[in-house]
């Protein structure tokens, strides 16, 4: 039987890589689009700045074709290079486009001067002039910059040009991090990163671009795979460089840290919180299939090479194999662990159709019960004695209890999945609290089949105190006191039957109070079940 299990694991690995070997035998070439890319022929600061302004206007012009805007994006992205044309020729390898690189030696009225002469060149220059005119007319006289003085600035020294180009390119590179995964909600994170570079004095806020222009550029990045491919090639290239790098290359490399692995948070969170925590729950038979899948995906990720972190940006078809829907049980368990021990994971949207509530709660419970667990291999490397290990485990348990009491709802990601409330079950709920709603669906608290009173009375105080600590004891005592108060109210209401009006009113108030008391009782029941 061991052979079939080994073959199953090997088959998973083969299935993940199926069809990736060999070369295509059929003619799979696609139609191409011709784009014109204007690059400076010299290092003149004045020429480069005028060409930069021209590219900014083309991208915001409503009359410019998409191919024209793509060419302008290539111009802006490569402007930091000493030889932009050589950079584009060496890195551009896109079967969807045919790049025509045009060296610009001079500018007239803000447009490049064509080297060749004749009616054709004159018509092209007139077309470029119309593109600039519509860009300025559509913006009602506004410039691409927040400070309009930057648009009319005449740059003649190289230091000012470098500062301006780095600032403009930094804003473009910041856009790519969310251009594919969340373009509609990207402004907040982009603003934080821009503020970071301003605070570090790595960019000049005088050359800050308007939000309208950034929106146009973000949309272009979302639509154009060719531009993203070129940017990814630059990211891969700048990582290969040695210790001596220019300012522009350093800031591009820094932004690349945010771009890496974009769109693959579920895969890497599963590895981090599902595997590397090494909780005993991984021994469950239900997880073995997902574990084999994750193992084969990790091997495949390594085989893809340096482009693997950017597979979502590059729209590679292999990216779908890394989606959490391929290993839903292990992912659900990992998300339960993550939302319990990592505060930053509380904001991650894990409300997916393939989320398994039972394994999500199992992850939460494992993270709580195994807080303070010690890795014996690491303890042996550090030379820790048994007393030191015990003290460390006790300290972690103590701090973990305080952390959970402080903000359980935020830490454990209380949210609605499929109309059922998950997580956050071990904190007391105010009697006046309303049921939580999310995405237009009312959350439903799980029904309890076990009697509350029987469960509360069946757990000795001593066992509860030792297993769950003081917090569990107090919660159980509160539960018992509420049950006793409820019984006293029922006895009092049964004696007030002489006056029918009073009896009816008392009965209605009692039912309303009982319903309110039931919510915290159910919540405390979750707490008892989670810790006993």
Swiss-Prot record:
One of its GO terms (cellular component) is viral nucleocapsid. Residues 1-402 are annotated as: Ncore. Belongs to the paramyxoviruses nucleocapsid family. Homomultimer; forms the nucleocapsid. Binds to the viral genomic RNA. N0 interacts with the phosphoprotein (via N-terminus); this interaction allows P to chaperon N0 to avoid N polymerization before encapsidation. Interacts (via C-terminus) as N-RNA template with the phosphoprotein (via C-terminus); this interaction positions the polymerase on the template. GO terms for biological process: negative stranded viral RNA replication; negative stranded viral RNA transcription. GO terms for molecular function: molecular adaptor activity; RNA binding; structural molecule activity. Forms the helical nucleocapsid (NC) in a ratio of 1 N per 6 ribonucleotides, protecting the genome from nucleases. The nucleocapsid (NC) has a helical structure with either 13.4 N per turn, approximately 20 nm in diameter, with a hollow central cavity of 56 nm in diameter. The encapsidated genomic RNA serves as template for transcription and replication; encapsidation by N is coupled to RNA synthesis. Forms the encapsidation complex with the phosphoprotein protein P. Before encapsidation, the newly synthesized free N protein, so-called N0, is chaperoned by P. This is Nucleoprotein. Ncore is globular and carries the regions required for self-assembly and RNA-binding. Ntail is an intrinsically disordered monomeric domain in the C-terminus. Residues 487-497 have a biased composition (Low complexity). Residues 422-444, 487-532 are annotated as: Disordered.
């Amino acid at each position: 039987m061991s052979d079939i299990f080994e073959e199953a694991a090997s088959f998973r690995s083969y299935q993940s890589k199926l069809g990736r070997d060999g070369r295509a035998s059929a003619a799979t070439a696609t139609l191409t689009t011709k784009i014109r890319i204007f690059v400076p022929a010299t290092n003149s600061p004045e020429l480069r700045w005028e060409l930069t302004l021209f590219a900014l206007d083309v991208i915001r012009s409503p009359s410019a074709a998409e191919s024209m805007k793509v060419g302008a994006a290539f111009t802006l992205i490569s402007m930091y290079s000493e030889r932009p044309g050589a950079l584009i020729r060496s890195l551009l390898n896109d079967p969807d486009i045919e790049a025509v690189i045009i060296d610009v030696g001079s500018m007239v009225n803000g447009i490049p001067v064509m080297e060749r002469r004749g009616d054709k060149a004159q018509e092209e220059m007139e077309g470029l002039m119309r593109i600039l005119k519509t860009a300025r007319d559509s913006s009602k006289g506004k410039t691409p910059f927040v400070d309009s003085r930057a648009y009319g600035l005449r740059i003649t020294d190289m230091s000012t040009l470098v500062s301006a180009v780095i600032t403009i390119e930094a804003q473009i590179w910041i856009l790519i991090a969310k251009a594919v995964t969340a373009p509609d909600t990207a402004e907040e994170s982009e603003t934080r990163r821009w503020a970071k570079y301003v605070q570090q004095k790595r960019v000049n806020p005088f050359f800050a671009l308007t939000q309208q222009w950034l929106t146009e550029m973000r949309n272009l990045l979302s639509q154009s795979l060719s531009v993203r491919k070129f940017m990814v090639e630059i990211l891969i290239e700048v990582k290969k460089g040695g210790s001596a790098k220019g300012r522009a290359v350093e800031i591009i490399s820094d932004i690349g840290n945010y771009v890496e692995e974009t769109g693959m948070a579920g895969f890497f969170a599963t590895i981090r919180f599902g595997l590397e925590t090494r909780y005993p729950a991984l021994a469950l038979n239900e997880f073995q299939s997902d574990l084999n899948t994750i193992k084969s995906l990790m091997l495949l990720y390594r085989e893809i090479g340096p482009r693997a972190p950017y597979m979502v940006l590059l729209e590679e078809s292999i990216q779908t194999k890394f989606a959490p829907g391929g290993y839903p049980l292990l992912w659900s368990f990992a998300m339960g662990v993550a939302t319990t021990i990592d505060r930053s994971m509380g904001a991650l949207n894990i409300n997916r159709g393939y989320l398994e509530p039972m394994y999500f709660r199992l992850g939460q419970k494992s993270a709580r019960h195994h807080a303070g667990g010690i890795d014996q291999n690491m303890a042996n490397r550090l030379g820790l004695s048994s007393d030191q290990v015990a003290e460390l485990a006790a300290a972690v348990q103590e701090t973990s209890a305080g952390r959970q009491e402080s903000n359980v709802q935020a830490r454990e990601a209380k949210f609605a999945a499929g109309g059922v409330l998950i997580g956050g079950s071990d904190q007391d709920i105010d009697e006046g609290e309303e049921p939580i709603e999310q995405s237009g669906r009312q959350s439903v608290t799980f029904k309890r089949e076990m009697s509350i009173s029987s469960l509360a009375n069946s757990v000795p105080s001593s066992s509860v105190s030792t297993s769950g600590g003081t917090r569990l004891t107090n919660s159980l005592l509160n539960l018992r006191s509420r049950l006793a108060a409820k019984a006293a109210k029922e006895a009092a209401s049964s004696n007030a039957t002489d006056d029918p009006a009073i009896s009816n009113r008392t009965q209605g108030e009692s039912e309303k109070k009982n319903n309110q008391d039931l919510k915290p009782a159910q919540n405390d029941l979750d707490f008892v079940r989670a810790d006993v």
